[in-house]
Amino acid sequence: MEKPAGRKKKTPTPREEADVQKSALREEKVSGDRKPPERPTVPRKPRTEPCLSPEDEEHVFDAFDASFKDDFEGVPVFIPFQRKKPYECSECGRIFKHKTDHIRHQRVHTGEKPFKCAQCGKAFRHSSDVTKHQRTHTGEKPFKCGECGKAFNCGSNLLKHQKTHTGEKPYECTHCGKAFAYSSCLIRHQKRHPRKKP
């Protein structure tokens, strides 16, 4: 036997569902019967795999002045809060916290310049120096003075320029007291002072 032809149940649109939820919230606020939503509690599985790989663990032990203490059950506990700077330059004695900084510094002594400009072949110790240098080829000047609008290819040049607006002259001659905005100007000035003969 066939079912009598009747109306099909209409599925609500997302907008209609949202309207129903909003009106239910309004009713809860008016009645004051609102309860916090229940969250299902899922038990967590204990972690079986180690948090750090052996290489990472070795790095952590190298980067920290590791100290151990016994907890209340006599088990040694690693305390990684006392940082040290384990990388010392064998040439000049400078100390570095990170191995990468130590490696970069070594290039000062070895003269190694592994980063080259693709356009002119000029070599640099650091990749950031190549980026700055390439602006001389492209003409890019991303650092603009907020006071006068003059643009510079290097942030340090902008900082130097801004002293012209502030009038700051932090470099003072020890012989005569004259002040300069730039250290290079002070050095040039000091060469003009007669040297004392012993």
Curated annotation (Swiss-Prot):
Record localization: Nucleus
Database matches in SUPFAM superfamilies: beta-beta-alpha zinc fingers
Disulfide bond sites: none
Molecular-function GO term, any one: zinc ion binding
Biased composition, class Basic residues, residue ranges: 1-12
Keyword hit for rRNA-binding: no
GO cellular component, one term: nucleus
InterPro entries: Znf_C2H2_sf, Znf_C2H2_type
Pfam families attached to this UniProt entry: zf-C2H2 (PF00096), zf-C2H2_4 (PF13894)
UniProt-listed GO biological process terms: cell differentiation; regulation of transcription by RNA polymerase II; spermatogenesis
PROSITE patterns the record matches: ZINC_FINGER_C2H2_1, ZINC_FINGER_C2H2_2
C2H2-type zinc-finger residues: 87-109, 115-137, 143-165, 171-193
Domain of life: Eukaryota
Region of interest called Disordered, as start-end residue ranges on this chain: 1-55
UniProt entry keywords in alphabetical sequence: Developmental protein, Differentiation, DNA-binding, Metal-binding, Nucleus, Repeat, Spermatogenesis, Transcription, Transcription regulation, Zinc, Zinc-finger
Annotated Basic and acidic residues bias: 13-38
Primary localization: nucleus
Similarity field: Belongs to the krueppel C2H2-type zinc-finger protein family.
Biological role: A putative DNA-binding regulatory protein associated with meiosis in spermatogenesis.
Protein name from the UniProt record: Zinc finger protein 41 homolog
Organism: Homo sapiens
